[in-house]
Amino acid sequence: MAIRLEKSGDQHRINLEKGASISGEININLDWSKGGFLKQMFGGAVDLDLGCFYELNDGTKNLIDGLQFSHGRGGNRHQVSRQGSYDQKPYIWHQGDDRGSGAASGETILVNPIGVNDIKRMVIYTFIYEGAAKWADTNAVVKVKVPGNEDVIVEMGQQNNNKKFCAIAELIFGGDNSITVRKLVTFHDGHSDCDRQYGWGFRYSPGSKD
């Protein structure tokens, strides 16, 4: 069984005190259709990148995605880097950039449950790094998986927006071992445009993964 958030604004509260959830990894996964072999070989497949804005209760704010930890700026889950950290603050770590490899599992961000009362909020987003905004071809789905709870599923649906950046979901950490997942699915011109809508206040400069 799973909880599906159908419309923008729909939300579901997860209680981390249920079952084994307080000791298991919180898994935020983006999966999408990468097309058949020929699409991957000749460049017709759409490659998505998963990322997040996050804010801690101590006021720390940052963002994590493949652009941020490219050029050797990432690290393993035990280190603190532009890829985040699982063992230390922010207790949020991106597993790595898929780069269109065709892997069935897509991209994943892990949240350490020992840090849930240190985290205030996250906005989960995806963007198309290269190519046209063919959202309808992606069948993109975000799943929030907490052991001992039903998965919370946010589907993008058949979108035809020509903007290449999409805020998919917001996670609100209640400070009481709870997480509320809210569906967004709003489209933006890029990181800075999304930042303005959701009030993060970062400054941006052009970047690349290559």
What residue spans do the PLM features occupy?
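Intrinsic-disorder/low-complexity signal
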Residues: 1-121, 125-210
